[in-house]
Design a protein with these regions (language model features):
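Eukaryotic scaffold repeat domains enriched in small/polar residues
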Residues: 1-156
Length: 156
């Protein structure tokens, strides 16, 4: 972290594979006091609170749901769900802040809702989910209705 003169105020982590350490961090998102960092070569996401304390980890290397091989884009929605683009499989995995897989969406392909080499992800203030679908040369937009919407009687 830098101040307005460019001086380093603090850093988070160091090289390694332990808790709070990184091996090729590639992306991060900050929302609702959570900092989620894609730790690509450790095949995980690490989650820190506003005091830079590690509060959660997501994933491990593998090819099953909840695992990752080429983690790419990351985002956090208004309910603190963490969305992770898995570039190799063409899916988006959604986790709670404790790292439990909630659901996935997408698959490898060219139809609407499919992805080929997804490379980025953004969630707007209305929980619109934007996925950069690089090989298909498009950005796909989805709307998450969430648990709050279910409680109010809306259909997810």
């Amino acid at each position: 972290m830098l101040d307005n003169t460019g001086q380093v105020l603090r850093t988070i982590g160091k090289h390694g594979s332990g808790d709070g350490e990184f091996n090729f961090p590639t992306e991060l998102r900050l929302r609702n006091g959570l900092l989620a960092v894609v730790d690509a070569m450790n095949f995980r996401v690490q989650i820190f609170d506003s005091g830079d304390r590690l509060v959660g980890k997501i994933g491990k290397m593998g090819d099953s749901s909840g695992q990752m091989y080429r983690p790419k884009g990351i985002a956090i929605d208004s309910e603190d769900h963490i969305y992770l683009v898995e570039g190799l499989w063409g899916v988006v995995q959604v986790f709670d802040r404790e790292g439990q897989l909630l659901y996935t969406f997408g698959q490898r392909g060219t139809r609407l809702g499919d992805f080929q080499l997804p490379a980025g992800l953004f969630i707007d203030n209305s929980d619109g989910v934007y996925v950069v679908d690089s090989y298909n040369r498009r950005v796909q937009v989805f709307q998450y209705h969430g648990l709050r919407a279910q409680a109010e009687g809306a259909k997810p």
